[in-house]
Amino acid sequence: MDGTLLNSQGEVSLTNAELIRNSGLPVTLVSARAPMEMREAIETLGLKGLQIGFNGALIYQMRDGNVKPIRVQPLVQNEVQELLTYIRKQFPTVSMSYYDLNNWYCDRIDEGIRYEHNLTHQQPTFITDEDKFLEATINIFKIMLISFSESEMQKLESTLRSLDMNNITIQRSGKAYLEITHVNAKKSIGIDYIFEKEKLKKEETAAFGDGHNDLPMFGRVAYPIVMENASDDIKAVA
C-alpha cells in the first residue's frame, strides 16, 4: 500500500478511489500493514472481499467494522521474546514494535514510532512489563524494526539472518523498515489462497507493488506492475 496505492499523506486519493470503485474489478489489498492500518483504505474503496495483512500472516475480511480472521500464521510465541531481547541488546537504537490482531505495541516512543504514527494515524499501546505481557497467550503476527540509517539497517538484517531461526522470515519493506513474520507468512501464500478460494486463473490477475516483499507475489500473477518509485532490481521483474 505504501508507495503503491497510498499518497504521501498515507491516504487513497479521491481520484484513485473513484476509479477503483467504478472499475467493477475485485480488489484485494496485500500489505505488510496490520488490519487497523488498512481499515481506512478498505472503507474508502468499499472492499468486501478477502484482504491480506502482515505480509501474508493474516487473511481476513472486514465485517461490520471488525476483523474476521480467515487464515492466521502468527510467530512462535517463545521466539518473539527471544528476538525482542536480542535486538534490544545488540541494536539499542533501532525502533522496535510489534502487532497482534488488533493492537500495535511498543515499550518506548522514539523517532520510528513517531514516524509510523504520522504515516498510519495509529496510536501504539505502551507496554511497561513486556516479560509479563508476553507470558500470556497472545498471537504476535509481526515485529517491525525501523532505522533511518542504511548501514545500521544492513547490519541489522545480516545479523538477524545469521541467527538461522527456521520459523521466521525477514523482509525489507521500504528503505527504513525491516519486518519479521512467520516463515509461512508470505504475500504469495496469501495470493495462492485467494486463487483457490475464488477459483481464479493466473491469466486473470495483476498485482501492483514497489518493494522486495512484493517479489513473491509478482511471481504468482500474469501481470506484475511495478511502480516508478521502485528500485531498479524490483523494476526488472515487470
Regions found by a protein language model. Give the residues of each.
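Asp-based, Mg2+/Mn2+-dependent phosphohydrolase catalytic module
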Residues: K201, P224-A238
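Conserved beta-strand/loop elements of the cytosolic catalytic core of P-type E1-E2 ATPases, chiefly
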Residues: L6, P74, T181-A185
